[in-house]
């Protein structure tokens, strides 16, 4: 077949010349030599005599845990020292009868004594109002004390001011507990009744089945709406189609449902 082709086409089918030989760049496989693998018995002497000058490097996780423990220890020591010196009975800023004093918390930081007086003077005459401020910056700490002249005015104000809005914030009212409750500690010393309750873990609710056993349903998607064997529906809503057929001579007078294929 090839001999019938013309010469120009036969030149296209001619074999190509062989590739030029180049010496290999790598070592031949038969001449390769790899390091010999030996056991670890000769290294046991180094494990028996530990280097006393070696100090292990502290990882980032170990450093984080160490700093956390040190910070917690300092916090506990600071609380112990503050509890020792805390004495509300001999505080020069605490003035007035403790049973006539109301405690206000969650105040707006721009609330002044005049705002509190305008809001609580309706319940009775006020002897003294003190908004606790920072000793260094002079800014409000968000809580205050109101001393009434009569104890009954305190009780009326305590009941009427629950959930009161003052300067756009809903405040919390309570009686003074520092001098009336034995062993009471404020929140800054680890006690108190305050705090943001939404940060606490809520109790988990038990999740049961979607369908209860006392609901009268069979469960699943049918819901238990099936016909009973007594000739009527299960819920007693009248006779079934078979009873209509027996009353009218075998002919069903109930409306037919159109079926769509």
Swiss-Prot record:
Oligomer status and interactors: Component of the spliceosome, where it is associated with snRNP U1. Associates with U1 snRNA.
GO BP terms, alphabetized: mRNA 5'-splice site recognition; mRNA splicing, via spliceosome
Biased composition range(s): Basic and acidic residues: 198-215
Name of this protein: U1 small nuclear ribonucleoprotein 70 kDa homolog
InterPro entries, alphabetized: Nucleotide-bd_a/b_plait_sf (IPR012677), RBD_domain_sf (IPR035979), RRM_dom (IPR000504), snRNP70_RRM (IPR034143), U1_U11-U12_snRNP_70-35kDa (IPR051183), U1snRNP70_N (IPR022023)
Function summary: Involved in nuclear mRNA splicing. Essential for growth.
Keywords annotated in UniProt: mRNA processing, mRNA splicing, Nucleus, Ribonucleoprotein, RNA-binding, Spliceosome
Disordered: annotated segments: 192-261
GO molecular function: mRNA binding; U1 snRNA binding
Disulphide connectivity of cysteines: none
One GO CC term on file: U2-type prespliceosome
Occurrences of domain RRM (ranges): 100-178
Biased segments, Gly residues type: 216-235
